[in-house]
């Protein structure tokens, strides 16, 4: 159900949500601010080019698995844009049709935009590749750390992003180490990621994540 709140805010109310809401993207459209609104201080806007006159492709926007109702906020004056008719609820997302020129040999995410590799480590007989990643389009934005693993550096398993854009800002480049001697106190063999969070509001902040 769509609820208009003034000229520039639309609330999407979803009952018994599926795994995803598939958002239609138009490359030439201006960005809208889209947020999963659960009333938490950690709720974060994502900049997404929602389709206005045509759909170039869809991207999945993850919904919480255990919620009975969900609200997604869209901050932008979109009027009767095409996106409202083309949004879809789904438990699956098949990216196989999104890129006819997808590389076969070189690593590439299943969908979205990627840039430089970050935090390359080897742990428990697996190579971990983290990289600059925007899961909501094919242009720069919404910086996450994408995450893939491999045993031979040729065949890759794509995992959920390791670090997602948050209220501190975009997740910019950094490095990772495997703390084999528990020097930092987060556990023997913990992976420590050091990176820069960046936003207009907060500037650049040096951050640490671990797992």
Spans of model-derived segments:
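Beta-rich carbohydrate-recognition and catalytic domains
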Residues: 1-211
């Amino acid at each position: 159900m769509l609820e208009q709140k003034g000229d520039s805010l639309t609330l999407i109310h979803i009952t018994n949500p599926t795994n995803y809401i598939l958002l239609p993207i138009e490359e030439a459209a201006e960005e809208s601010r889209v947020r999963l609104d659960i009333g938490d201080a950690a709720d974060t806007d994502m900049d997404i080019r929602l389709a206005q006159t045509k759909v170039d492709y869809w991207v999945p926007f993850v919904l919480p698995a255990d919620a009975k109702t969900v609200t997604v906020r869209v901050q932008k004056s979109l009027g009767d844009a095409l996106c409202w008719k083309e949004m879809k609820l789904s438990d699956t997302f098949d990216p196989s049709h999104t890129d006819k020129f997808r590389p076969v040999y070189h690593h590439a995410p299943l969908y979205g935009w990627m840039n430089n590799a970050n935090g390359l480590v080897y742990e428990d007989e697996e190579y971990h590749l983290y990289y600059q990643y925007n899961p909501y389009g094919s242009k720069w934005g919404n910086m996450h750390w994408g995450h893939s693993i491999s045993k031979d550096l040729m065949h890759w398993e794509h995992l959920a992003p390791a670090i997602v854009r948050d209220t501190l800002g975009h997740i910019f480049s950094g490095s990772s180490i495997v703390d084999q001697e528990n020097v930092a106190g987060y556990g023997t063999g913990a992976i420590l990621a050091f990176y820069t969070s960046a936003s207009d509001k907060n500037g650049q902040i040096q951050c640490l994540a671990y797992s």
